[in-house]
From Swiss-Prot:
<dbReference type="GO" id="GO:0044342">
    <property type="term" value="P:type B pancreatic cell proliferation"/>
</dbReference>
<dbReference type="GO" id="GO:0071550">
    <property type="term" value="P:death-inducing signaling complex assembly"/>
</dbReference>
<feature type="binding site">
    <location>
        <position position="176"/>
    </location>
    <ligand>
        <name>Zn(2+) 2</name>
    </ligand>
</feature>
<dbReference type="GO" id="GO:0005524">
    <property type="term" value="F:ATP binding"/>
</dbReference>
<feature type="compositionally biased region" description="Polar residues">
    <location>
        <begin position="239"/>
        <end position="271"/>
    </location>
</feature>
<dbReference type="GO" id="GO:0031434">
    <property type="term" value="F:mitogen-activated protein kinase kinase binding"/>
</dbReference>
<dbReference type="GO" id="GO:0045944">
    <property type="term" value="P:positive regulation of transcription by RNA polymerase II"/>
</dbReference>
<dbReference type="InterPro" id="IPR002219">
    <property type="entry name" value="PE/DAG-bd"/>
</dbReference>
<feature type="zinc finger region" description="Phorbol-ester/DAG-type">
    <location>
        <begin position="138"/>
        <end position="184"/>
    </location>
</feature>
<feature type="binding site">
    <location>
        <position position="155"/>
    </location>
    <ligand>
        <name>Zn(2+) 2</name>
    </ligand>
</feature>
<feature type="modified residue" description="Symmetric dimethylarginine; by PRMT5">
    <location>
        <position position="563"/>
    </location>
</feature>
<feature type="modified residue" description="Phosphoserine; by MAPK1">
    <location>
        <position position="296"/>
    </location>
</feature>
<feature type="binding site">
    <location>
        <position position="184"/>
    </location>
    <ligand>
        <name>Zn(2+) 1</name>
    </ligand>
</feature>
<dbReference type="GO" id="GO:0008285">
    <property type="term" value="P:negative regulation of cell population proliferation"/>
</dbReference>
<dbReference type="InterPro" id="IPR003116">
    <property type="entry name" value="RBD_dom"/>
</dbReference>
<dbReference type="GO" id="GO:0008270">
    <property type="term" value="F:zinc ion binding"/>
</dbReference>
<keyword id="KW-0472">Membrane</keyword>
Length: 648
């Protein structure tokens, strides 16, 4: 009751409505104002009376031209009295210093410790200022539509349309604007201030305040709101960012705000425990040698996720055993290569049946979330250059999505290099034509040729050269749907000499272009070499047999085709093969690669051919019994055929 009467007297004696009486459990709403130091008005002098001392209150001038009055209880420190008033304004005692205004000396003030007994200051005027070495700026708000998943840093609710500070990254709804902290702080500098108070004080010329102690830091962490312990975004509690200075010693000007929610971290990690942060700080304070300081940034993050992007050379020296600990940690999402998510552990794939082997590897049927095809490549002990080149090509292959392309599902690098693709129940085109001798009709053969050209046109649009185009790598999936496989992978289909990649003739001899056989260029593979191989596939479709079947010597075929002495015999094409298809086969297997058409032209030619094929139109007089509205409308006698009438 005495506190209430004292507060009322204080207000009635001239403090006005702008002053607030603060209790330890009271709370007021902060407002967004321009940031500049508070200046006392001349009218404020002399307003204090002896009633302030009798009411156990202290008048405090705060930054950003704000002021308040707090009640003092016995046993409370200055930190305890002002903590609530600072917190609701988005301020931290660790960022501020408190001074006692000297009444006998106008304009002078004496610095106080945050641990000072507040009872000894009853009736005094205090002033809270920002520390000189705490970088402060005004907010730079801009309206923003958040297309990616985002949450308000005030109410923690979903945020679509709102505002965002361009400097510190603080984002909020429009109706939450009154609760935004008034100061805009580079929190990476605050981390330096907390962890290296001695160096910071020496640089700025201001002695470090005694409140910067481990006990104060632990108290600040322990007072973290319960809601913020489950989220990584809170403007009222410090999060220790591990962004380190660059080699020039200057901090980045656009550090990511600690108030921005890390949604992917929330879904994959446990809530932040304050004890983890305390242990990290304690381990840092105990390490006094430079080598210990160089390895400490990896341990400062409570989740172990943040890593410096440009580490200084001293940070590369790691303590023994740190490598094994880092292997057990989850790699940070921001630092991961995108191909990381496509790498499959060998223990997750179960190999069953061996399907066959080729010049570049062996294919197995396996189980990995269903049936898959696993091609183990014939690369023994890959060098780091080969492994990196393999990953680079996998990064291209994983972006392929087409109805006529085998779906790439992942890759493996442990023990052996392997590619995992979708499993096709159907057989290859080679098996259909030359083993099972399936009899396709002409329109089916033309449709297979069209789908193959369509898939190759897609690969070339992605700048992927197949290098091994043949009927063995064309699969008929679920009927007559064409799937092209074993494309790309120049790393595997080339010969390596040390760290240098050397091109060599690859693929089966019958489908190799003359310039590939000759190997006169450093890289003879091109879009036209794929067109030649496609022309041989067209020859297989339109003849049902392989080219050069009259030559049994492989070396002779290589010599004659490479020299230009031999070419596929076009007289063996089917008699009912359209003339446009015959011309297309002849154009694709031309000896000069510049004279061969590219796949956009090939695809348009086949599509025109399909439209020009004669079709049997449906007879207008043919009865459509299934279209009848009611079965009783159809006379039953019309459904029975008289034996005297001929049946057509």
């Amino acid at each position: 009751m005495e506190h209430i009467q004292g507060a009322w007297k204080t207000i009635s004696n001239g403090f006005g409505l702008k002053d607030a009486v603060f209790d330890g459990s009271s709370c007021i709403s902060p407002t967004i104002v321009q940031q500049f130091g508070y200046q006392r008005r001349a009218s404020d002098d002399g307003k204090l009376t002896d009633s302030s001392k009798t009411s156990n209150t202290i008048r405090v001038f705060l930054p950003n031209k704000q002021r308040t009055v707090v009640n003092v209880r016995n046993g409370m420190s200055l930190h305890d009295c002002l903590m609530k008033a600072l917190k609701v304004r988005g301020l931290q005692p660790e960022c501020c210093a408190v001074f006692r205004l000297l009444q006998e000396h106008k304009g002078k003030k004496a610095r106080l410790d945050w641990n000072t007994d507040a009872a000894s200051l009853i009736g005094e005027e205090l002033q809270v200022d920002f520390l000189d070495h705490v970088p402060l700026t005004t907010h730079n708000f801009a309206r923003k539509t958040f297309l990616k998943l985002a949450f308000c840093d005030i109410c923690q609710k979903f945020l679509l349309n709102g505002f965002r500070c361009q400097t510190c990254g603080y984002k909020f709804h429009e109706h939450c604007s009154t609760k935004v902290p008034t100061m805009c702080v580079d929190w990476s500098n605050i981390r330096q201030l907390l962890l290296f108070p001695n160096s910071t004080a020496s640089d700025s010329g201001v002695p470090a305040p005694p409140s910067f102690t481990m006990r104060r830091m632990r108290e600040s962490v322990s007072r973290m709101p319960a809601s913020s312990q489950h989220r990584y975004s809170t403007p009222h509690a410090f999060t220790f960012n591990t962004s380190s200075p660059s080699s020039e010693g200057s901090l980045s000007q656009r550090q990511r705000s600690t108030s921005t929610p890390n949604v992917h971290m929330v879904s994959t990690t446990l809530p932040v425990d304050s004890r983890m942060i305390e242990d990290a700080i304690r381990s840092h304070s105990e390490s006094a040698s430079p080598s210990a300081l160089s390895s400490s940034p990896n341990n400062l993050s409570p989740t172990g996720w943040s890593q410096p992007k440009t580490p200084v050379p001293a940070q590369r020296e790691r303590a023994p055993g740190s490598g094994t600990q880092e292997k057990n940690k989850i790699r940070p999402r921001g630092q991961r290569d995108s191909s990381y998510y496509w790498e499959i552990e060998a223990s997750e794939v179960m190999l069953s049946t061996r399907i066959g082997s080729g010049s570049f590897g062996t294919v197995y049927k396996g189980k990995w979330h269903g049936d898959v095809a696993v091609k183990i490549l014939k690369v023994v002990d890959p060098t780091p250059e080969q492994l990196q080149a393999f990953r680079n090509e996998v990064a291209v292959l994983r972006k392929t999505r087409h109805v006529n392309i085998l779906l790439f599902m992942g890759y493996m690098t442990k023990d052996n290099l392997a590619i995992v693709t979708q499993w096709c129940e159907g057989s290859s085109l080679y098996k259909h034509l030359h083993v099972q001798e399936t009899k396709f009709q002409m329109f089916q053969l033309i449709d297979i040729a069209r789908q193959t050209a369509q898939g190759m046109d897609y690969l070339h649009a992605k700048n992927i050269i197949h290098r091994d185009m043949k009927s063995n790598n064309i699969f008929l999936h679920e009927g007559l749907t064409v799937k092209i496989g074993d494309f790309g992978l120049a790393t595997v289909k080339s010969r390596w000499s040390g760290s240098q990649q050397v091109e060599q003739p690859t693929g089966s001899v019958l489908w190799m272009a003359p310039e590939v056989i000759r190997m006169q260029d450093n890289n003879p593979f091109s879009f036209q070499s794929d067109v030649y191989s496609y022309g041989i596939v067209l020859y297989e479709l339109m003849t049902g047999e392989l080219p050069y079947s009259h030559i049994n010597n492989r070396d002779q075929i290589i010599f004659m085709v490479g020299r230009g002495y031999a070419s596929p015999d076009l007289s063996r094409l089917y008699k009912n093969c359209p003339k446009a298809m015959k011309r297309l086969v002849a154009d694709c297997v031309k000896k000069v690669k510049e004279e061969r058409p590219l796949f956009p032209q090939i695809l348009s030619s086949i599509e025109l051919l399909q439209h020009s094929l004669p079709k049997i139109n449906r007879s207008a007089s043919e009865p459509s019994l299934h279209r009848a509205a009611h079965t009783e409308d159809i006379n039953a006698c019309t459904l029975t055929t008289s034996p005297r009438l001929p049946v057509f």
